[in-house]
Amino acid sequence: MDFSDALRAIKRGKMLCRAGWNGRHLRIFMVDSTERPVKDGDAMAQRVPVGTMLGHNNHIGILAKDGTVTPWLASQQDLLADDWMIDDGGVEESFVRGSAA
């Protein structure tokens, strides 16, 4: 599928990957908006009182092999690719946090 179809699938809550990615365990998905308090020592604590709830907007995240999630931005190759796939939902051992080889 192309990126337009992939984006629609992400908005429906699907997890996706590309056949052309070198990291075969990488998946992208929608990270829902959340709120979290400013903590003492946070960079924001210099401008916002500790304990203030800050909103975090929806964004696309990428799930790495070690189980960590990072905000993701599409490259030009990702935007133009036709090899997007919806994750079949299978659980891979390699997705267990801390098991990266």
What do the PLM-derived regions correspond to, one by one?
Residues 11-12, 54-58:
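A short, compositionally biased
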Residues 56-101:
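Short, compact, well-ordered microdomains
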Residues 1-7, 70-73:
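Short acidic, Pro/Gly- and aromatic-enriched capping/linker segments at domain boundaries
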Residues 7-9, 52, 76-77:
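A general structural signal for short secondary-structure junctions and capping/turn motifs
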Residues 4-25, 29-48:
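Catalytic phosphate/metal-binding cores of nucleic-acid and nucleotide-processing enzymes, i.e., regions
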Residues 46-52, 94:
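Generic detector of short, locally flexible boundary/turn motifs and exposed helical patches
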Residues 1-5, 52-54, 64:
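Short, 15-30-residue, compositionally biased linear elements
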